[in-house]
Structure formats: C-alpha cells, structure tokens
UniProtKB/Swiss-Prot annotation:
Database matches in SUPFAM superfamilies: Ribosomal L27 protein-like
Gene Ontology terms, MF aspect: structural constituent of ribosome
Family under the similarity heading: Belongs to the bacterial ribosomal protein bL27 family.
Gene3D superfamilies in alphabetical order: 2.40.50.100
Protein name: Large ribosomal subunit protein bL27
Record's keyword terms, sorted: Ribonucleoprotein, Ribosomal protein
Source organism of this protein record: Geobacillus stearothermophilus
Disordered as annotated region, ranges: 1-20
C-alpha cells in the first residue's frame, strides 16, 4: 500500500499546440495557383490533377481553377484542381 498520495500535477501539466491540419479550401471553391488545399501528416488525401505535394505532405494547387475532392476506389481520397472554361 502506498504511503504517499499519487499527485502528478506539476509533471503532467503540459500539452502540445494544435497543428491546424485538414482542408483549407472547400469542394467547388475557386483557387489560384500556389494556394494550400490540404495540410496533413502522411498521405491521408492524395494529389490529383494539377495538385502538387510539398515536403511536409501539404497539397497545393498548381493552376488557377475549381477544387474537387474525389474518391479513388473504396478507401482512398484525392483532391484535384480543374481549370475554369473560358466560354462566356
């Protein structure tokens, strides 16, 4: 039986800051080239058409266009950017 009460308030009182991961642009939204679309750790979402992947797995738009979040098969997601047609 312990003779001291187990108190860990000074050792346990720390937490890491949030990394603000996740989608930064919505499906159907217009983006410019270089815009960050999705911040992530690993490839939770894969790069599709006109989307690049940074060194920290961040997905970004390579061209101006409309964002589309798509499914690749049953368990994989991808984000693409499609150019806006010039018919007006």
């Amino acid at each position: 039986m312990a003779s001291k009460k187990g108190v860990g308030s000074t050792k346990d009182g720390r937490d890491s800051i949030a990394k603000r991961l996740g989608a930064k642009r919505a499906d159907g939204q217009f983006v410019t080239g270089g815009s960050i679309l999705y911040r992530q750790r690993g490839t939770k979402v894969h790069p599709g058409l006109n989307v690049g992947r940074g060194g920290d797995d961040t997905l970004y738009a390579k061209i101006d266009g409309i964002v589309r979040f798509e499914r690749l098969g049953r368990d994989r997601k991808r984000v693409s950017v499609y150019p806006v047609s010039q018919e007006a």
